[in-house]
Amino acid sequence: MPKARVYELAKELGVDSKTVLSKLEAMGEFVKSASSTVEPPVARKLRNAFASSGQGNASDSKKPGHTAKKPAEPASHSMPKPAAPSAPKPAAPAAPKPRHAASKSDAPKPGHRAPRPGESRQHGNRPNGNAPRPQGGDRRQSGRPTAVPGARPQHGNAPQGGNNANGAKPHTPGPRPGNNPFSRKQGMHTPTPGDIPRPHPMNRPSVNNGEGRRGGRPGQGGGQRGGFRGRPGQGGAKPGQWGQHRPGQGGGQRPAGGGNRFGGNGGGFQGGNSAPSNGPARGGRGRGGAAGAFGRQGGKSSKARKNRLAKRQEFQEMKAPVIGGVRIPTGNGQEVRLRQGASLADLAEKINVNPAALVTVLFHLGEMATATQSLDEATFQILGEEIGWNIKIVSAEEEDKELLQQFDINLDEEELQEDGDLKPRPPVVTVMGHVDHGKTRLLDTIRRTNVIEGEAGGITQRIGAYQVTVNLEGEPRKITFLDTPGHEAFTAMRARGAELTDVAILVVAADDGVMPQTVEAINHAQAAHVPIVVAVNKIDKPGANPDKVRGQLTEYGLVPEEYGGNTMFVDISAKQGTNVDKLLEAVLLTADAELDLRANPDMDARGATVEARLDKGRGAVATVLVQSGTLHIGDAIVAGTSYGRVRAMLDENGNHMQEAGPSTPVQVLGLTSVPTAGDLFLVASDDRTARQIAEKRQATERAAQLAKRRKVVSLESLKEQFAKSEVDMLNIVIKGDSSGSVEALEDSLMKIEVSDEVGIQVIHRGVGAITQNDVNLATVDKAVIIGFNVRPNRQVADLAEREGVEIKYYSIIYKAIEDIEASLKGMLKPEYEEVVTSHSEIREIFRSSKFGNIAGVMVQDGEVKRGTKCRILRNGIATVNDLEISSLRRFKDDVTSVKEGYEAGINLGTFNDIEIGDIIETFEMQEIERK
């Protein structure tokens, strides 16, 4: 059914549009103007409201293709009182007459079975024209009879209309269109004033709250079809009780041949409801009207119905402010929590709006983004201020804590432990300092092993974790050591080591003194509130000056005890092993004096990943430091985005362990992937929980990376960005032997800045050998593969050679940085400068019909070459630039060049504007090196 507009309804009801708008507003329906459309249920309510108030001309709704009929007036104001009821009795089929008043006797009698909805077509006969009419007086209303709402046709086994059971006040019938959609008057019977019946009330058995028979199936109306007899026992309803009927119940009686064009009742309402003038129609789901003459569905579409929630939401949207052409419900300062890397779709789900509306608002604010694109915090803040929501981006720590709380895991559980459950644990000591100041040599001396020979260039490329036993006053004490790199590329790894440690040993060479990485190590330790023990190393070397080191460190807040401070200094020689035992005693004394190192070994293990790598035979191998609890073989663990079950545990010497207590470093086997160095690990209740936590972290990490990479495109800078040439990117695939080395190499490469014209993009990073997938990825993206302490097998190397993929191998990190920086400089677009090669004076002009003007010149300096660029200088002013020497002759011979002091003939192609005395200056564009 097409939607009616407000001015059409006003014209139909006989009132002005302002009255209709006021009425709609009073009904709770907010319409903008007289040209706005109104839903069919709302139009029906409007007609009922005008009919009940006696204002306007209430008429039935119009079916598609029907013209509006003159509305009926309530008969209760002028109709005579019906006669006394008479006993119901069967009557012969009634002849086609105008509609009669409905009566309760239309319902089936007790003991009679109500016919099924489909029986009317099979058993219904044409009405008999000899049936008597109900008694009633004649009356005129506005020159034509009025329709009687609620009246139903007389049926073969129903009591006659003259025997009404109660004092119903019927309406006089009005004409209805025929069943033929091509003729409006087929089957029409226009009654005369004498034909208007006067109904008589009669008793009606089996009445339920005054309601008539239940409606037929959807699309089948209660009114009788034109030319067919109604079903036996089909009841009507009392006028004034239409508000109690469901949609789909029968409507009024219809004369023979006067059925609705689309079937259903004569009221014209979908679902079989007529439009009474004395009661509002109820909503809800009914059985609908008849299917119509040509099988069209007469019932109301379920999509067109609106429940209260939809109307309330529509009302709220109408009150919402309009931004960029869309309505967004204002938040009034309410807080919305979003994770890092969230998209507009995530925000739309939180505030219950359409994501497309937020895209439009963001575009209105000058930024373009898709609904699923990750946005940064600044963009969300701008959007939140515009729509009235306080958008708060949850930090990674808070988000991870909320994630674990979903699985009943409390990270603050250890703080709630009772003192009786806590037991002493060994201190975790980090060895920090500048590169090549002897950190690894010191650990080598402590552990009595030789690990420095395995490090490329004598530089530690990864974090090592070891545990040693020290005798302090005859009592064995354990100390856990972490070795952090000293190279400047490993800033993140030093910071991570400071976060895991309890006491820091700062190694400073006595001959070098304080260096840049020494200051950085001090800052990391002080930021983590870690006590520092200074080891002044290399005191056995010539030129060593420990007092100079003490004086330099005083400037950074490390005052020795002999100077009145609280920092312990120990002069050692890691190579000779001098005073190493005193250094260990100083570490234990500092830990006992300043720290309360206790943990609960009976809880589930928690800790941090120190380093991780991919072993060819054992898979992912992670070195973890247990900080609290005890880790057992068979525990389900999750470390960052990796998860698995502990299959084996090894100590630093390769010995198998069954459990690992607090402050114990251990190698764990059994993870499905290689975790990142620094990821926290914890024990989950089962494998399923560990997998779900890891997968949720993977999704969060990916969204955060997308938000970090997102380039903000604003409308102001869009034209400028289009004008600029695209930046040439060097795509890189990084593979390394450990996660710490890969992380450090990536961070160092991303810091390289050569020019705005070139850049680096790491498209993939991973731990382990170079695989075929890496080569395929590099082939597609035209990338360079960097292998850090890893090599491909023969098949992968052959594939890379066939595909033309370059693989570079490095074992020292700064060598890789230098090569990549040189490659970026080679990618720069070349710059050119102009170099003048010769000057030639025109002394004669020869005119040729074939070649034009030919200049006879004398080469004054340099060398004139054919095909070079040139310009004309006249009185020292360049008249024409970007000419080309198309022909060069020496007498009658074509030559390629003419040197200084010789005469030549020069033709400049189609350019003939030359004069005697002009100078022809030749030049070349030579490429210069970019720096």
From Swiss-Prot:
Residues 156-168 have a biased composition (Low complexity). Residues 82-96 have a biased composition (Pro residues). HAMAP family: IF_2_B. Its main location: cytoplasm. Residues 217-238, 248-271, 281-298 have a biased composition (Gly residues). It holds the Pfam family IF-2. This is Translation initiation factor IF-2. Residues 537-540 are annotated as: G4. It comes from the Bacteria. Residues 50-59 have a biased composition (Polar residues). GO terms for cellular component: cytosol. SUPFAM superfamilies: Initiation factor IF2/eIF5b, domain 3, P-loop containing nucleoside triphosphate hydrolases, Translation proteins. Residues 483-486 are annotated as: G3. It is found in: Cytoplasm. Residues 32-310 are annotated as: Disordered. It comes from Bifidobacterium adolescentis (strain ATCC 15703 / DSM 20083 / NCTC 11814 / E194a). Gene3D superfamilies: 1.10.10.2480, P-loop containing nucleotide triphosphate hydrolases (3.40.50.300), Translation factors (2.40.30.10), Translation initiation factor IF- 2, domain 3 (3.40.50.10050). Residues 573-575 are annotated as: G5. Keywords: Cytoplasm, GTP-binding, Initiation factor, Nucleotide-binding, Protein biosynthesis. GO terms for molecular function: GTP binding; GTPase activity; translation initiation factor activity. Residues 433-440 are annotated as: G1. Belongs to the TRAFAC class translation factor GTPase superfamily. Classic translation factor GTPase family. IF-2 subfamily. InterPro entries: EF-G-like_DII (IPR053905), EFTu-like_2 (IPR004161), IF2_II (IPR044145), IF2_N (IPR006847), P-loop_NTPase (IPR027417), Small_GTP-bd (IPR005225), T_Tr_GTP-bd_dom (IPR000795), TF_IF2_bacterial-like (IPR000178). The gene is infB.
